[in-house]
Curated annotation (Swiss-Prot):
Transmembrane segments: none
Function: Component of the BRCA1-A complex, a complex that specifically recognizes 'Lys-63'-linked ubiquitinated histones H2A and H2AX at DNA lesions sites, leading to target the BRCA1-BARD1 heterodimer to sites of DNA damage at double-strand breaks (DSBs). The BRCA1-A complex also possesses deubiquitinase activity that specifically removes 'Lys-63'-linked ubiquitin on histones H2A and H2AX.
Protein name: BRISC and BRCA1-A complex member 2
Recorded name of the encoding gene: Babam2
Span list, region UEV-like 2: 275-364
Positions carrying Phosphoserine: 2
Residue ranges of the region described as UEV-like 1: 30-147
Species for this entry: Rattus norvegicus
CDD domains: BRE (cd23664)
Superkingdom as given in the UniProt entry: Eukaryota
GO terms under cellular component: BRCA1-A complex; BRISC complex; cytoplasm; nuclear ubiquitin ligase complex; nucleus
Protein family according to the UniProt entry: Belongs to the BABAM2 family.
Protein backbone atom coordinates (compact mmCIF):
# COMPACT_ATOMS: atom_id res chain seq x y z
CA UNK A 1 0.00 0.00 0.00
CA UNK A 2 1.43 3.39 -0.99
CA UNK A 3 1.83 6.03 1.73
CA UNK A 4 -0.73 8.30 0.07
CA UNK A 5 -3.42 5.62 -0.08
CA UNK A 6 -2.76 4.68 3.55
CA UNK A 7 -2.93 8.29 4.73
CA UNK A 8 -6.25 8.82 2.99
CA UNK A 9 -7.78 6.16 5.24
CA UNK A 10 -6.39 7.56 8.52
CA UNK A 11 -8.55 9.66 10.82
CA UNK A 12 -7.71 13.32 9.99
CA UNK A 13 -6.75 14.18 13.58
CA UNK A 14 -4.17 11.36 13.58
CA UNK A 15 -2.92 11.86 10.04
CA UNK A 16 -0.01 14.25 10.93
CA UNK A 17 1.58 11.60 13.21
CA UNK A 18 1.35 8.84 10.63
CA UNK A 19 2.39 11.13 7.78
CA UNK A 20 5.64 11.94 9.58
CA UNK A 21 6.30 8.22 10.04
CA UNK A 22 5.67 7.02 6.48
CA UNK A 23 7.12 10.04 4.64
CA UNK A 24 10.17 10.85 6.73
CA UNK A 25 10.52 7.87 9.02
CA UNK A 26 13.94 6.25 8.81
CA UNK A 27 14.93 4.35 11.91
CA UNK A 28 18.13 2.44 12.50
CA UNK A 29 21.03 1.66 10.21
CA UNK A 30 19.21 0.77 6.99
CA UNK A 31 18.53 4.25 5.64
CA UNK A 32 17.43 2.82 2.27
CA UNK A 33 14.23 1.37 3.78
CA UNK A 34 11.52 3.60 5.21
CA UNK A 35 8.93 2.70 7.78
CA UNK A 36 5.61 1.58 6.30
CA UNK A 37 2.15 0.73 7.57
CA UNK A 38 -0.32 -2.03 6.72
CA UNK A 39 -3.49 -3.59 8.13
CA UNK A 40 -5.32 -0.32 8.71
CA UNK A 41 -8.38 -0.76 10.92
CA UNK A 42 -10.81 1.35 12.89
CA UNK A 43 -11.92 1.05 16.50
CA UNK A 44 -14.83 3.38 15.84
CA UNK A 45 -18.44 2.31 15.48
CA UNK A 46 -19.82 1.67 12.02
CA UNK A 47 -21.77 4.93 12.27
CA UNK A 48 -18.59 7.02 12.51
CA UNK A 49 -17.99 8.85 9.21
CA UNK A 50 -14.73 8.05 7.46
CA UNK A 51 -11.89 8.20 7.09
CA UNK A 52 -11.62 6.83 10.62
CA UNK A 53 -8.78 4.27 10.74
CA UNK A 54 -6.89 4.65 14.01
CA UNK A 55 -4.84 1.44 14.32
CA UNK A 56 -2.36 -0.23 12.04
CA UNK A 57 0.70 -2.45 11.83
CA UNK A 58 4.05 -0.65 11.59
CA UNK A 59 6.86 -2.37 9.65
CA UNK A 60 10.32 -1.45 10.95
CA UNK A 61 13.56 -2.62 9.26
CA UNK A 62 15.97 -3.83 11.92
CA UNK A 63 19.14 -5.95 11.59
CA UNK A 64 17.93 -7.52 8.36
CA UNK A 65 14.54 -8.39 9.86
CA UNK A 66 11.23 -6.55 9.66
CA UNK A 67 9.63 -5.87 13.03
CA UNK A 68 5.84 -5.73 12.90
CA UNK A 69 4.34 -3.78 15.76
CA UNK A 70 0.68 -2.88 16.20
CA UNK A 71 0.00 0.76 17.03
CA UNK A 72 -3.42 1.54 18.45
CA UNK A 73 -4.77 5.08 18.71
CA UNK A 74 -8.29 6.11 19.70
CA UNK A 75 -9.79 8.36 17.04
CA UNK A 76 -12.33 9.61 19.61
CA UNK A 77 -9.46 10.93 21.76
CA UNK A 78 -6.70 11.82 19.26
CA UNK A 79 -4.77 13.81 21.85
CA UNK A 80 -3.91 10.62 23.76
CA UNK A 81 -0.76 8.58 23.02
CA UNK A 82 -1.16 5.18 21.36
CA UNK A 83 -0.80 1.68 22.77
CA UNK A 84 1.76 -0.72 21.32
CA UNK A 85 1.65 -4.48 20.79
CA UNK A 86 5.00 -6.01 19.84
CA UNK A 87 3.73 -8.99 17.86
CA UNK A 88 6.02 -12.01 18.03
CA UNK A 89 8.30 -10.25 20.52
CA UNK A 90 6.06 -10.94 23.51
CA UNK A 91 9.13 -11.05 25.78
CA UNK A 92 10.06 -7.48 24.88
CA UNK A 93 8.87 -5.30 27.76
CA UNK A 94 10.18 -1.75 27.31
CA UNK A 95 10.98 0.40 30.31
CA UNK A 96 8.32 3.16 30.45
CA UNK A 97 10.65 5.50 32.35
CA UNK A 98 13.01 5.52 29.34
CA UNK A 99 10.23 6.45 26.89
CA UNK A 100 10.45 10.20 27.44
CA UNK A 101 8.49 11.16 24.34
CA UNK A 102 5.67 8.82 25.33
CA UNK A 103 5.56 10.09 28.92
CA UNK A 104 5.46 13.70 27.72
CA UNK A 105 3.31 13.03 24.63
CA UNK A 106 2.85 16.27 22.69
CA UNK A 107 -0.05 15.97 20.21
CA UNK A 108 0.87 19.33 18.67
CA UNK A 109 4.18 17.86 17.45
CA UNK A 110 3.66 15.81 14.23
CA UNK A 111 6.87 13.87 14.93
CA UNK A 112 5.91 12.67 18.41
CA UNK A 113 4.97 9.17 17.19
CA UNK A 114 8.21 8.83 15.22
CA UNK A 115 10.21 9.92 18.28
CA UNK A 116 8.52 7.27 20.43
CA UNK A 117 9.19 4.59 17.79
CA UNK A 118 12.88 5.54 17.79
CA UNK A 119 13.03 5.22 21.58
CA UNK A 120 11.33 1.84 21.40
CA UNK A 121 13.78 0.60 18.75
CA UNK A 122 16.69 1.65 20.99
CA UNK A 123 15.22 -0.39 23.83
CA UNK A 124 14.55 -3.28 21.47
CA UNK A 125 18.24 -3.23 20.53
CA UNK A 126 19.18 -3.54 24.20
CA UNK A 127 16.67 -6.38 24.57
CA UNK A 128 18.31 -8.29 21.70
CA UNK A 129 21.81 -7.64 23.04
CA UNK A 130 20.72 -9.06 26.38
CA UNK A 131 19.62 -12.29 24.71
CA UNK A 132 23.20 -12.90 23.58
CA UNK A 133 24.12 -13.72 27.19
CA UNK A 134 22.83 -17.22 26.52
CA UNK A 135 25.93 -17.80 24.36
CA UNK A 136 29.40 -16.95 25.64
CA UNK A 137 30.76 -17.01 22.07
CA UNK A 138 28.18 -14.59 20.68
CA UNK A 139 28.54 -12.38 23.75
CA UNK A 140 32.29 -12.25 23.11
CA UNK A 141 31.64 -11.13 19.52
CA UNK A 142 29.32 -8.40 20.75
CA UNK A 143 31.54 -7.12 23.56
CA UNK A 144 34.69 -6.92 21.44
CA UNK A 145 32.83 -4.89 18.81
CA UNK A 146 31.32 -2.69 21.51
CA UNK A 147 34.81 -1.72 22.69
CA UNK A 148 35.45 -0.12 19.29
CA UNK A 149 33.23 3.01 19.02
CA UNK A 150 33.35 2.99 15.21
CA UNK A 151 31.58 -0.37 15.29
CA UNK A 152 29.77 -0.45 18.64
CA UNK A 153 27.85 2.76 17.99
CA UNK A 154 26.68 1.59 14.55
CA UNK A 155 25.46 -1.94 15.19
CA UNK A 156 22.13 -3.78 15.29
CA UNK A 157 21.70 -7.31 16.64
CA UNK A 158 18.91 -9.80 16.19
CA UNK A 159 18.98 -13.05 18.15
CA UNK A 160 16.70 -15.70 16.68
CA UNK A 161 14.42 -17.93 18.68
CA UNK A 162 16.05 -20.83 20.54
CA UNK A 163 15.61 -24.27 18.99
CA UNK A 164 13.67 -26.39 21.51
CA UNK A 165 15.43 -29.57 20.35
CA UNK A 166 19.06 -28.45 20.22
CA UNK A 167 19.01 -25.48 22.57
CA UNK A 168 20.82 -23.47 19.87
CA UNK A 169 19.79 -20.10 18.51
CA UNK A 170 21.01 -18.02 15.60
CA UNK A 171 22.06 -14.38 15.68
CA UNK A 172 22.65 -11.68 13.12
CA UNK A 173 24.97 -8.70 13.48
CA UNK A 174 24.32 -5.73 11.18
CA UNK A 175 27.08 -3.12 11.12
CA UNK A 176 27.36 0.21 9.37
CA UNK A 177 30.91 0.22 8.04
CA UNK A 178 33.03 3.34 8.70
CA UNK A 179 33.98 3.90 5.05
CA UNK A 180 34.25 7.40 3.58
CA UNK A 181 32.32 7.78 0.31
CA UNK A 182 32.45 11.59 0.16
CA UNK A 183 35.19 11.77 -2.50
CA UNK A 184 33.53 9.50 -5.05
CA UNK A 185 33.10 11.55 -8.27
CA UNK A 186 29.62 13.06 -8.33
CA UNK A 187 28.85 11.86 -11.87
CA UNK A 188 28.90 8.27 -10.58
CA UNK A 189 26.27 9.10 -7.96
CA UNK A 190 23.66 10.47 -10.35
CA UNK A 191 20.45 9.04 -11.76
CA UNK A 192 19.99 6.13 -9.37
CA UNK A 193 16.61 7.23 -8.05
CA UNK A 194 14.87 10.38 -6.90
CA UNK A 195 15.58 9.89 -3.20
CA UNK A 196 18.75 7.84 -2.85
CA UNK A 197 18.97 8.32 0.90
CA UNK A 198 22.23 8.08 2.79
CA UNK A 199 25.31 6.63 1.11
CA UNK A 200 26.04 3.64 3.31
CA UNK A 201 27.62 0.19 3.43
CA UNK A 202 26.09 -2.40 5.75
CA UNK A 203 27.71 -5.69 6.66
CA UNK A 204 25.36 -8.45 7.79
CA UNK A 205 26.94 -11.45 9.53
CA UNK A 206 24.66 -14.35 10.45
CA UNK A 207 25.72 -16.93 13.03
CA UNK A 208 23.61 -20.03 12.48
CA UNK A 209 24.76 -21.62 15.74
CA UNK A 210 26.27 -20.42 18.99
CA UNK A 211 29.67 -21.99 18.33
CA UNK A 212 30.16 -20.07 15.05
CA UNK A 213 30.63 -23.17 12.92
CA UNK A 214 28.28 -21.73 10.27
CA UNK A 215 28.78 -18.02 9.65
CA UNK A 216 27.44 -16.21 6.59
CA UNK A 217 28.51 -12.63 5.83
CA UNK A 218 26.82 -10.41 3.24
CA UNK A 219 27.55 -6.85 2.17
CA UNK A 220 24.74 -4.40 1.36
CA UNK A 221 25.50 -1.13 -0.43
CA UNK A 222 23.07 1.74 -0.84
CA UNK A 223 21.98 2.15 -4.51
CA UNK A 224 24.28 5.06 -5.40
CA UNK A 225 27.36 3.40 -3.90
CA UNK A 226 26.61 0.08 -5.57
CA UNK A 227 26.29 1.90 -8.90
CA UNK A 228 29.48 3.92 -8.33
CA UNK A 229 31.53 0.81 -7.54
CA UNK A 230 30.49 -1.02 -10.69
CA UNK A 231 27.33 -2.89 -9.68
CA UNK A 232 26.45 -5.66 -7.26
CA UNK A 233 28.83 -8.18 -8.83
CA UNK A 234 31.90 -5.91 -8.64
CA UNK A 235 32.71 -6.47 -4.98
CA UNK A 236 33.21 -9.90 -3.45
CA UNK A 237 33.91 -10.04 0.27
CA UNK A 238 35.94 -12.91 1.74
CA UNK A 239 34.26 -15.83 3.45
CA UNK A 240 34.21 -15.72 7.24
CA UNK A 241 37.29 -17.70 8.33
CA UNK A 242 36.88 -20.83 10.41
CA UNK A 243 37.73 -19.99 13.99
CA UNK A 244 37.69 -16.27 13.16
CA UNK A 245 35.93 -13.49 15.01
CA UNK A 246 34.14 -10.32 13.97
CA UNK A 247 36.65 -7.90 15.46
CA UNK A 248 39.23 -9.26 12.98
CA UNK A 249 36.88 -9.85 10.05
CA UNK A 250 35.03 -6.51 9.96
CA UNK A 251 38.23 -4.40 9.49
CA UNK A 252 39.20 -6.68 6.57
CA UNK A 253 35.92 -5.90 4.81
CA UNK A 254 36.33 -2.19 5.58
CA UNK A 255 39.83 -2.26 4.10
CA UNK A 256 38.61 -4.07 0.98
CA UNK A 257 35.78 -1.58 0.46
CA UNK A 258 38.02 1.42 1.14
CA UNK A 259 40.50 0.17 -1.47
CA UNK A 260 37.66 -0.24 -3.96
CA UNK A 261 36.55 3.34 -3.35
CA UNK A 262 40.13 4.55 -3.78
CA UNK A 263 40.41 2.65 -7.08
CA UNK A 264 37.31 4.46 -8.34
CA UNK A 265 38.57 7.88 -7.22
CA UNK A 266 42.05 7.23 -8.63
CA UNK A 267 40.52 5.96 -11.87
CA UNK A 268 38.57 9.19 -12.33
CA UNK A 269 41.66 11.39 -11.90
CA UNK A 270 43.81 9.11 -14.07
CA UNK A 271 41.20 9.11 -16.86
CA UNK A 272 41.10 12.89 -16.77
CA UNK A 273 44.90 12.99 -17.01
CA UNK A 274 44.79 10.47 -19.90
CA UNK A 275 42.27 12.48 -21.92
CA UNK A 276 44.12 15.75 -21.26
CA UNK A 277 47.28 14.15 -22.68
CA UNK A 278 45.42 12.94 -25.79
CA UNK A 279 43.95 16.41 -26.32
CA UNK A 280 47.49 17.77 -26.22
CA UNK A 281 48.99 15.12 -28.54
CA UNK A 282 46.17 14.86 -31.10
CA UNK A 283 44.76 18.41 -31.04
CA UNK A 284 42.21 18.87 -33.83
CA UNK A 285 42.08 15.11 -34.33
CA UNK A 286 39.84 14.86 -31.27
CA UNK A 287 36.22 14.53 -32.41
CA UNK A 288 34.57 14.25 -28.99
CA UNK A 289 35.20 13.11 -25.44
CA UNK A 290 33.33 12.59 -22.20
CA UNK A 291 34.00 15.79 -20.24
CA UNK A 292 32.21 14.58 -17.09
CA UNK A 293 33.38 11.06 -16.31
CA UNK A 294 36.27 10.96 -18.83
CA UNK A 295 35.25 7.47 -19.96
CA UNK A 296 35.26 7.92 -23.75
CA UNK A 297 37.34 9.62 -26.41
CA UNK A 298 37.04 9.59 -30.20
CA UNK A 299 39.80 10.56 -32.64
CA UNK A 300 39.60 11.17 -36.41
CA UNK A 301 42.99 10.39 -37.96
CA UNK A 302 44.52 9.92 -41.41
CA UNK A 303 47.23 7.59 -42.65
CA UNK A 304 48.31 7.92 -46.31
CA UNK A 305 44.94 9.42 -47.28
CA UNK A 306 43.08 6.67 -45.39
CA UNK A 307 40.77 8.25 -42.80
CA UNK A 308 39.69 6.28 -39.77
CA UNK A 309 38.23 6.76 -36.31
CA UNK A 310 39.64 5.49 -33.03
CA UNK A 311 37.17 5.11 -30.18
CA UNK A 312 38.83 4.77 -26.78
CA UNK A 313 36.81 3.37 -23.87
CA UNK A 314 38.35 3.86 -20.45
CA UNK A 315 37.11 1.41 -17.77
CA UNK A 316 35.95 2.32 -14.27
CA UNK A 317 39.09 0.87 -12.69
CA UNK A 318 41.56 2.51 -15.07
CA UNK A 319 44.60 2.41 -15.11
CA UNK A 320 44.53 -1.06 -13.52
CA UNK A 321 42.23 -2.19 -16.34
CA UNK A 322 43.41 -1.47 -19.88
CA UNK A 323 41.39 0.79 -22.23
CA UNK A 324 39.81 -0.71 -25.34
CA UNK A 325 40.79 0.81 -28.71
CA UNK A 326 38.21 0.41 -31.48
CA UNK A 327 39.43 1.28 -34.99
CA UNK A 328 36.67 2.20 -37.44
CA UNK A 329 36.90 2.87 -41.16
CA UNK A 330 34.93 5.86 -42.43
CA UNK A 331 34.55 4.21 -45.87
CA UNK A 332 33.75 0.55 -45.37
CA UNK A 333 30.57 -1.12 -44.14
CA UNK A 334 29.75 -4.58 -42.85
CA UNK A 335 26.91 -6.70 -44.25
CA UNK A 336 24.65 -5.34 -41.50
CA UNK A 337 25.28 -1.75 -42.61
CA UNK A 338 27.61 -0.79 -39.76
CA UNK A 339 30.96 0.89 -40.28
CA UNK A 340 33.70 -1.75 -40.38
CA UNK A 341 35.62 -1.81 -37.08
CA UNK A 342 38.10 -3.82 -35.04
CA UNK A 343 38.52 -3.68 -31.25
CA UNK A 344 42.02 -4.00 -29.82
CA UNK A 345 43.21 -4.67 -26.28
CA UNK A 346 46.46 -6.37 -27.22
CA UNK A 347 48.74 -3.36 -27.51
CA UNK A 348 51.67 -1.95 -25.49
CA UNK A 349 50.33 -0.78 -22.14
CA UNK A 350 51.41 -0.36 -18.55
CA UNK A 351 49.25 1.01 -15.72
CA UNK A 352 52.38 2.64 -14.34
CA UNK A 353 52.73 5.03 -17.30
CA UNK A 354 51.45 8.57 -16.89
CA UNK A 355 48.95 10.05 -19.33
CA UNK A 356 51.60 11.65 -21.51
CA UNK A 357 53.50 8.37 -21.92
CA UNK A 358 50.26 6.54 -22.76
CA UNK A 359 49.43 9.09 -25.46
CA UNK A 360 52.90 8.77 -27.01
CA UNK A 361 52.76 4.98 -26.96
CA UNK A 362 49.26 5.01 -28.46
CA UNK A 363 50.38 7.27 -31.31
CA UNK A 364 53.26 4.89 -32.07
CA UNK A 365 50.91 1.90 -31.96
CA UNK A 366 48.44 3.56 -34.35
CA UNK A 367 51.20 3.88 -36.97
CA UNK A 368 52.06 0.18 -36.75
CA UNK A 369 48.49 -1.14 -36.63
CA UNK A 370 46.72 1.05 -39.20
CA UNK A 371 48.26 -0.59 -42.31
CA UNK A 372 46.87 -4.00 -41.36
CA UNK A 373 43.55 -2.46 -40.31
CA UNK A 374 43.27 -0.71 -43.68
CA UNK A 375 44.00 -3.97 -45.45
CA UNK A 376 41.36 -5.78 -43.39
CA UNK A 377 38.81 -3.03 -44.07
CA UNK A 378 39.31 -3.32 -47.85
CA UNK A 379 39.20 -7.12 -47.66
CA UNK A 380 36.17 -7.52 -45.40
CA UNK A 381 34.18 -4.31 -45.74
CA UNK A 382 32.06 -2.88 -48.52
CA UNK A 383 32.37 0.64 -49.87
Amino acid sequence: MSPEIALNRISPMLSPFISSVVRNGKVGLDATNCLRITDLKSGCTSLTPGPNCDRFKLHIPYAGETLKWDIIFNAQYPELPPDFIFGEDAEFLPDPSALHNLASWNPSNPECLLLVVKELVQQYHQFQCGRLRESSRLMFEYQTLLEEPQYGENMEIYAGKKNNWTGEFSARFLLKLPVDFSNIPTYLLKDVNEDPGEDVALLSVSFEDTEATQVYPKLYLSPRIEHALGGSSALHIPAFPGGGCLIDYVPQVCHLLTNKVQYVIQGYHKRREYIAAFLSHFGTGVVEYDAEGFTKLTLLLMWKEFCFLVHIDLPLFFPRDQPTLTFQSVYHFTNSGQLYSQAQKNYPYSPRWDGNEMAKRAKAYFKTFVPQFQEAAFANGKL
